[in-house]
């Protein structure tokens, strides 16, 4: 984990040195994809199965809070111009020293500082009980065939497959919703872009509430009881598309976020538990990350296609609701839930 935070820091420094932003972000993304299995795998190894839902609830709360805090901090840094002539000085200094003139050097410095502190904190984590069974992280150990077999193995497991299916579907829909909410805030509510971002923050607040409730109300053996939350989320999407009043949009967005948080946390815990039993704690999270990111890419590509075709927002929201409804109904049927 410390090494991956150091790699993220390297990506930021590369951007400062004039490396193309796409390549720099690819380095940061590579580090993030390796960091997540270590983080969630550590949780799986650190707490007993009966506490896994609660641990995931607190982890989800902390992640969303960090996103909100980071977004707010970024806005403050971008809006802070410092003393008179500060921006021009930064641009001149960074051009001479780094070869890339920028007025945002103080923003990059804060990001580097945060990644550096995170790497130092991660370095203090003590090895868990599964340390002896871990494969060293090196390119020679990377095997697509082995990874694909692990992927199929997790999908074929009755409990692991359902939880992986639900989280994959959730993240694909959620990725589109991030952009759809901004567009809806502008077209339906008449808000500017910066105010539309507040609507996104309301969803995040709802996720925090839902994650905390899930950690308090559910245990691993009752994780299947949260599946109908997916149907509630599907019902809310087309309703939001027709809302034109901010006072009504606020509770709807928070309710949608809460439904998503309550659905995601127990499913994550169930997937981690089954994945650790079938594969290993870290490997199962890597499989989960692969499927979820593939879902995000696919859904965003489809969303871009609908925008290119000029499909109205209400129709896009309705299609999202239908995808979620048709996707969740097979696993939400009473007979199916009893079989889990």
Where do the model's predicted regions map?
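Structural signature of the two symmetry-related core transmembrane helices
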Residues: 1-13, 224-240, 318-321
